[in-house]
A protein has these predicted regions:
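An acidic, low-aromatic, low-complexity terminal/linker signal
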Residues: 1-176
Length: 176
């Protein structure tokens, strides 16, 4: 059976969801990406992360942020970007993701190499993500945005969270 999330129609829908507006631009390796700024709750320094057994390598574990347990995914590893050693600009972007199947929004942390800036992209700046032939999982992208001569890949954190943290995990972390 074919995964409907990988269909051309699903890709077109995701590209249409790359709304014009403000994006927090981040770096993973040498590449630049964008996260909708309205999803971002805060940016924190990299802190100790508690590993969770039987998780894939890109799920680094959980952190305790003011009494809430928050799952943390290393976006570098998730996107196949060679992850060098963590450094002074490596940080965790804490975002509010929408749970699948109409669940309540919850906090979700992603490790990034650096935060660049907040950029504004007009509708004309955003195009659908091209088909990379399986090299990149486009389910996690909402589009590509032009910024001068550069191109920023726009990330769908809701899709990443839905793929990484199963619904059962949300009940394991009440109040998160």
């Amino acid at each position: 059976m074919t995964d409907p999330a990988l269909s051309p129609a699903a890709n077109a829908t995701r590209a249409a969801s790359a709304a014009p507006g403000k994006y927090l631009t981040i770096t993973l390796g040498r590449e630049s990406y964008g996260i909708p700024v309205l999803k971002v709750r805060e940016i924190i320094r990299l802190c100790p992360i508690t590993r969770v057994a039987n998780m894939p390598p890109h799920v680094r574990g959980v952190i305790n942020l003011r009494g809430k347990v928050i799952p943390v995914v290393d976006l570098r590893t998730r996107f196949g970007v060679p992850a060098g050693a963590d450094h002074d600009r490596t940080c965790i972007v804490v975002a509010q993701v929408t749970a699948p199947a109409g669940g309540s929004p919850r906090p979700y942390g992603v490790i990034v190499d650096a935060v660049e800036e907040v950029a504004t992209f007009a509708a004309a700046d955003i195009q659908p993500a091209p088909d990379f032939g399986g090299a990149i999982d486009t389910r996690f992208l909402t589009g590509m945005a032009h910024q001068g001569a550069a191109v920023k890949t726009l990330i769908d954190l809701d899709a990443i969270a839905a793929a990484e943290i199963p619904l059962a995990a949300s009940s394991a972390f009440p109040g998160s």
